[in-house]
Amino acid sequence: MPDTNPIDIAAAWFRHATNRDTDAVMALAADAVEVGGARGSGTGRELLREWIDRSRAEMTPTRWFARGDLVVVEYEAVWRNRAGRDMGRRVMIVTFRVEDGRIAGIYRHDDLAASLTINGLDAGDAIEAPDAA
C-alpha cells in the first residue's frame, strides 16, 4: 500500500527531485496538482514536470514544519556547473499540500515566516527531519 503520510510524501519528493527521478516525482503528484512559485502559478502534472526539469538544483532540507495535510520545508538549494563547481546557493521554502496520499499543491516561497503564516502554521509546528530526507 502506498504511503499516505504527508511528511513521508514530502521527504520522498525531495529524494526523487534531488536524484532527478522525474517519473518518481510525478507518481507522487495528483493529476490536477497546483504549482506556485516566483514565475507564477498553474495547474497540472506537466507544469510540475517542467519545474523539476528546469530546477537543476541540489536540495538539502534544513527545517521541517507540519500540521495535518500541510508540510513546509526550508531547504538549501545549490546550483553547480558541469565540473561540479558551486555556482550559487540560496535558502528556499516549499509548501506541500497533500490530499488522498498525493501532492495536491506545491508552492515555493522565499520567506519562511511568511510561508508559515500563509499556511496557518507557526514555530510550534516544527518537527524532526524525517529519516529519509
Predicted segments, located by residue:
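A solvent-exposed, acidic/Ser-Thr-rich amphipathic alpha-helical stretch
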Residues: 2, 22-70
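Short, aromatic-enriched amphipathic alpha-helices that serve as compact interaction elements
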Residues: 2-20
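A beta-strand edge to alpha-helix "cap/lid" segment located at domain peripheries
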Residues: 5, 9, 49-133
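Short stretches within intrinsically disordered, low-complexity N-terminal or propeptide regions
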Residues: 12, 19, 31, 128-131
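Short, flexible active-site loop motifs that bind/organize anionic cofactors or intermediates
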Residues: 12-15, 38, 105
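Alpha-helix C-capping/helix-to-loop hinge sites
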Residues: 16, 35-36, 79
